[in-house]
Amino acid sequence: MSGIGEERPRELRWYHAGPMLFGDLGTSRLYVLGLAFYFTRHASFFHIIAVNILLVLVSCCYLIICRKYPEGGGVYSSARHSSKVLAVIGGLMLSADYTVTAALSCLDAFRYLGVEAEVSGFRLELACTLGAIGAIGLVNWFGPRGMGRVAMVVAIATIFLTFVVAICAIPHLQHMRVEFPVKERYNLSAWGDAWVGFTEVVLALSGIEAIANMTGIMVPPVRVTSRRSILPVLMEVVIMNLVLAAAMNALPDAKLINPEGHPQGTDNMMAVLATAYVGPTFSLVASFVFGALLLSGVNTAVTDLMAVQYMMARDGEAPRILTRLNRHGVPGYALIISLLIPSLLLVIFPDITELAGLYSVGVVAAITINLLATGYTRQFQLGGWERWMLVLVGGLMGAILITLLWTKPTARAFSLAILNMGLAARMVTLAGRANVPAATGRMFQGIGGLVFLAQGAITFFLPAQAWEFLFFSVANTIFLALLSGYLSRKIPEKVVRRHLENFDGDYDPITYHLVAANRPSTFIHGVLEDAQKSKAGVIIVFVRNLAHSLSGSAAHHAMADDQEAREVFETALDFANNLGVPLDLVYLPGGPI
């Protein structure tokens, strides 16, 4: 693999990112509808309304996050300004979610496609699932736009077919049967059961965190690209989920519950609705498209699992080799790992029910950390209502997280295992970089390796419900966080050359202020403050006078190599980022006239 650099190119447009987001959010209805009925029966309509309200609130928060973090708005980027350990924890939690999402979506895709045979004792659907993950990785090797185009075609086909099902179902909605989630309004336990039922179906949120991780490769202005990516998808998902939830509850119980009293269609409810309201032939075609949509969701998960590794490695929290790009601007080694981890999970847990038990905790934890870290940060200005919304929605997500940790021991165990094994691997990396005696570094690396193996052992040999597992896992987390904190303080601060590019800001400027500067100055801050008040942009011009004519090699005199220019531009970018003012950088090298 020939690395050509470490800065990924910005080539993802809204019509690439939007379908990729739909590949995650849109897939939610393929299993959320069935799971909602499985857990809450005819009270599922109210639960889906509540999930949609939560989805709108979280999406509004992520519009703010994408605007404020154009270099990457995922949990790792936002939490890093508060705490390196917290950022790594958020990144690992998100990685756990992406791993399960990729494995679960890919396996469910072949359920929709009807692949369930066995060949020589080996399940054909599992073989197809592993092959599909490899094929998705091969396409991603050539950059995100390829799968973005495929995702766009699949998204358009899915929206059309879903619209047909919804239109055909509308005349039957008068038969909808709805039950209030709380059967005894004055019974506190009944309200608790309703809350737990709601948390069981909060599965549609990982796509929002995924789109935030893509801001680092979106074409500028990122705030516009992210908004155009999120809002149309959000509108379609919310409206169609409500209509389809009503259509599901309008079906007779004979089509929803089998003679033994167990819910049907838990993993393919959209196929059930297509058969009931349109017909079996249409359902067959729709199932093929729905399977393709699930594979699109796999692509989104793999892309963002790769992005998290890239950002952590770029900051020295993971091996530097993960930042090495191939000739197409893709971190190749990170891509390979992003394919191997969900494939290994599928080999260990080859059943949809088992995989579903690992879901939710990771993404809810990541979103909680992201919202609260952004809401409490002081590195940039936020409107009063923006800060309050981030904090309040983050608090709500925190309550959901606590509930999931209590009620889903398998998901809790899986998330703790990923967290501790990731922290142990991080400690090994930090020990190799820390300014400590060689023997001390080897000792820390040995401790990290032992903790890694110990966490793997207790995960496999202790039941997830056992208090011993919880005790040892939490103790490992605290132990690793403390040791890693010590090692981080022993690592010399490395001067990282900031990538200089124009800053989009929070608004479209109606005019521009032009400033010529040859050194950092508080005057620049004053101009930016005035520009913020009048919704203007600022252009900073640095003129480099050269004592020779600009020809030959001098014609390539670069802004990045001019230390004085870098100081001016970096100072201006810091001020602009804090105030949210659009800033353009102009570097003019010139010789004598």
Regions found by a protein language model. Name each.
Residues 33-91, 103-132, 234-242:
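Extracellular loop-to-transmembrane helix junctions
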Residues 3, 152-207, 213, 235, ...:
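Helix-loop-helix junctions that connect adjacent transmembrane segments
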Residues 74, 229-297, 321-347:
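TM-loop-TM module centered on a large, flexible mid-protein loop between adjacent transmembrane helices
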Residues 464, 503-564, 568, 575-586:
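Small/aliphatic-rich secondary-structure junction motif
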Residues 85-87, 122-130, 219-240, 310-347, ...:
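Loop-to-transmembrane helix boundary motifs in multi-pass membrane proteins
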